[in-house]
Amino acid sequence: MKTFIIRFIHITAIFLGLVSLAFSQTPPAPGEPKRFPQITLEQLPPDARPLGEEIIKISSVGLGGPYNVMLRSPVFADRMKRLLDYLRFNTSLPTRLNEFAIIIQGKVWRSQVEWYAHYPLAIKAGLPQQVADDLKAGIRPRDMKPDEAVVYDVSMEMINNHQISDALFQKAKAILGEQQLVDLVAVSGTYVTVAMLLALGQEMPPAGKPLPFP
């Protein structure tokens, strides 16, 4: 009986996890205002405007997307931007793998903006189209290179098990090295935060652009 209960709980947990992944981040209901009206440079406190100007220079969505939410807390936004500057532009991970890690979280969270913004960057950086499309379809990507497979496996084990096995750790360290492995987990966790901020604000791709996850 005890074994049955444990198996039932395990199966239920898996089912609930799959159900949760079926929900996409959704826009406001028709006629409803945005949770966070789009902020402008002029609306920022004077001491936060230099930060806003920096964001506009590097962001594909200007002050939109996660920045529209983050800037409600300017000190946090400043710290987060500095972290993102490292994880986007100065990380030890090759861009192909870094963007792959980001869209894995975009898929798991079904984050419309995260996928919209980073899918083309992943392809541009050399991630095979089939790998990205298989990921979006919800299947283990086929024909991954060894380093891509490690990024996928580490990301998914962390998501599903909240840890990785000793065997995967040793494999990942052998392929990526210690610094890249740490940077991989850091970028993955940071983009969970980004996905949550986007969900909080119900931020969507620019008007007229199709939703990646209908």
Identify what each model region corresponds to.
Residues 9-20:
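Bacterial N-terminal signal peptides
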Residues 23-214:
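Hydrophobic alpha-helical segments
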Residues 1-7:
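N-terminal secretory signal peptides that target proteins for export/translocation
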